Amino acid sequence: MEELKHECGVAMIRLLKPLEYYEKKYGTWMYGLNKLYLLMEKQHNRGQEGAGLACVKLQANPGEEYMFRERALGTSAITEIFEAVHSNYASLTETQLHNAEYAEQVLPFAGEIYMGHLRYSTTGKSGISYIHPFLRRNNWRAKNLSLCGNFNLTNVDEIFEKITAKGQHPRKYADTYIMLEEVGHRLDREVERLYAKCENEGLEGMDITYAIEDQIDLANVLKKTTPGWDGGYVICGITGSGECFSIRDPWGIRPAFWYADDEVVVLASERPVIQTAFNPSSNSIKELLPGQALFVNKKGNIRTEQINLPKNNNACSFERIYFSRGSDKDIYQERKQLGKNLVKPLLDAIKNDIDHTVFSFIPNTAEVAFYGMLEGFEVYLNQLKKRYLTTLKNGVSEQELEHILSMRIRFEKAVIKDIKLRTFIAEGNTRNDLAAHVYDITYGSVEPYSDNLVVIDDSIVRGTTLKQSIIGILDRLHPKKIIIVSSSPQ
């Protein structure tokens, strides 16, 4: 079996109004920055190895910076990058802090386009240089490019050979760098095509720049690069001239959702984080379809376009089982159903002995499947009570009735997660030492030597933790039998 690899998280925001609008309506021009923080923090489950953000300022004069980036490593990376951004504003007066025009002209990260990334490595490579977003700089605004993504390409070698055959010399052999150079190369060619066109039309100087930025079409860039990408991906990008895009793989392996109103366009890896941050109805949030791209140009015009033909749907099942937050309405019901599916095999395992069985779950992601499992057992128990009552032909004594009505599913919080450690990303002795201390138990939750203990997990990802910590510590409760079940695979 292939080693489990986590998925990253992405977030992108395009403000459609001037910063002054948000200052007046929401009391701060930092509306976009604050919303990006919320989107990233709500997707912290997707990446604890590092985080980064990028920003583009649409209104900047030559000689002024217009593209900004901040990155950090570690589980506190989100806090660190936003603290670094806000450190630029620490010395401002209250008047300056609420002056949107001043912010737009002077302050870094006071822009209209924001992009954030949460990283879990799928390659084993680590270090700040591997933290997204990546930047490709140029003196032409339209040639500046920042990329981030949630992806795992299977043909990196092939892409590397393709771009080196054209004469490029990538500075690193890493998938994101290679994608950055490939997209950047095509972006350069698109800008140069438009430059030649504008020159032929008699334009000069900054008029050429403005014409290029008005006419550039990133769909042309993606149509010449992404067909050669094999694997699952959601790639987000912003240019220095104010275009932004996101594209999804044609198999629909990696997820992306987006929402737009008259104030903002937002995209994220998960639907409920958009609901939480912006409070739209779930029906107004759209899924980015397989092979489809979302574009917002410099003027704020929004469109989607089918860049690659969709292929057989191969959406990542583990995304719905484990990676995503369980607060998505569809994922919540799916995880509950996975728990319900376990009722029959569990009844066989405990020999229908409900009275002497305690049910619990391994926190925290297995909780939803646990609720589904309990609902399934409640249905079974109600059927059992009904059968008992209908078989008692001579009436029911008060004692018999009391016994039947008192029958219940016994559930306890037998397992406690003390500290938030991901043991499957550690190695060797460190991995075992960590696993031994991640979980604890609730003493007295099981009748020793009498009760069966059934514990549900949501996946097989915690194989090391089960072996090194959970089973051993559950045994301290002295149950008659320990049964560990997985909601997926079953």
Question: Where are the regions that the model predicts?
Answer:
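Catalytic or ion-translocation cores adjacent to nucleophile or general acid/base/metal-coordination motifs
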Residues: R171-Y173, I178, N220, L384, ...
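Conserved short alpha-helical segments that host acidic/polar catalytic motifs at enzyme active sites
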Residues: M1-L289, F295-V358, I362-P363
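Phosphate/ATP-binding catalytic cores across multiple sugar-kinase/actin-like superfamilies
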Residues: G228-G231, E334-D355, M373-G376, A426-Y449
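Terminal amphipathic helices with adjacent charged low-complexity linkers/tails
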Residues: G300-C316, F361-S397
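Short secondary-structure boundary/capping segments
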Residues: I163, W251-I253, D261-D262, M373-Y380, ...
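PRPP/pyrophosphate-binding module of the type I phosphoribosyltransferase fold
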Residues: N432-Q490
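Short, glycine/charge-rich flexible loops or terminal/linker lids adjacent to PRPP-binding catalytic cores
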Residues: E375-N452, T464
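Gly/Ser/Thr-rich loops at beta-strand to alpha-helix junctions
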Residues: N152-T154, F361-A369, I460-T464
